[in-house]
Amino acid sequence: MDCFRCAAARLFACVTLALTAGVAADAAPAETVRVGIIGASSDAPFFIADAKGYFGAEGLALELMSFDSGAKMVAPLGTGDLDAGGGAVSVGLYNAVKRGVGLKVVADKVHYGPGYGFASLLVRKELVESGKFKSYADLKGLRVAISGVGIGDESVLNEALKRGGLKWGDATPVYMGFAQHPPALANGAVDASITNEPTSTFIQRQGSAVRFAGNDEFYPNQQTAVLLYGEPFIKNRRPVALKFMRAYIRAVRFYNDALAGGRLAGPNGPEVISILTRYSSLKDADLYRVITPPAIDPNGAVNLESLTKDWQFFKDTGQLDGKVGPSDIVDTSFAAEAVAAFGPYVAGTPAK
């Protein structure tokens, strides 16, 4: 009897220990991931993954940190003050890596897919209606607003010039933020612009300029923005970085099922618009229904060919010495591992 009681006691203790361990595991605190955002619709994957509980399902807690631009995320990514963020692959990014700032491009965040020209070449209405502007060749001698020096939009303008048989320097770039594009076009300070949504739609509604072409028409699939990981996040918290990527890819696939006909008009469109109005700086649901949204690869694939084209442009214009190139800053292993777990993207089928 004593032996039976001892055995029963040991069994009870083991079961109790197992249950306690299970409760402890369930109660384990979530891993915090600090993510840099600019609050625009291009941050949709972060917002969707949070709203849909994809980060929570991976045991992650998202800490969103707002920045004025992606460029300002570079330094904190390198120091570990920021784990992930979104930004453009610019001259500044290449030079930061050259100086020893540790970060990697790990997935697509925005590209100009067919029908999804999130940015456009706008031309003053007066020039179009008068017949002075009819083709890309008519960019010669014009003042074209672009949002900054040493960024992909310079390469975009260069591609537009090439379509007209022109070269860099045949048009005059005028550097100004997107918020300055509407008044500059309205008062004739510039003749044309490379402008992102929603500012592009605002300008067209204002009536000062017309959309000559979406960027997807003259520079298709340009790698416009990317998901960045800081080196400390990669080296010190790789399992967490992989969990983040799984949640990100799930969100990107949900986002893709919101797209149809160059709008957020797919099956998931209403829910994505609802999420964007909650999380982003733009709160107008009706505007989201009419603007052209960005394309994001459902597998997170990075367009290395586009990055190389832009890098070559920066090098040819003397902005880079070429010592650090696209292959030095891209790490596709996280996206590849996440996609391997989910399988190929099938429209309308949630990644689980």
Indicate where each model-derived feature is located.
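Short, glycine-/small- and polar/acidic-enriched structural segments
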Residues: A28-K167, T172-Y175, D191-E197, A213, ...
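Bacterial N-terminal signal peptides
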Residues: R10-G22
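Secondary-structure end/capping motifs
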Residues: K235-G322
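Conserved C-terminal helix/tail region of periplasmic/extracytoplasmic solute-binding proteins
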Residues: T308-K352
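Periplasmic-binding protein-like
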Residues: H111-S120, Q204-F233, R237, M245, ...
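Bacterial N-terminal signal peptides that target proteins for export
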Residues: M1-A13
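Short, hydrophobic alpha-helical packing/hinge segments within bilobed ligand-binding/sensory domains
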Residues: M73-V74, G92-L93, H181-A184, T199-S200, ...
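Boundary of Sec targeting at the N-terminus
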Residues: D26-E31, S280, D284
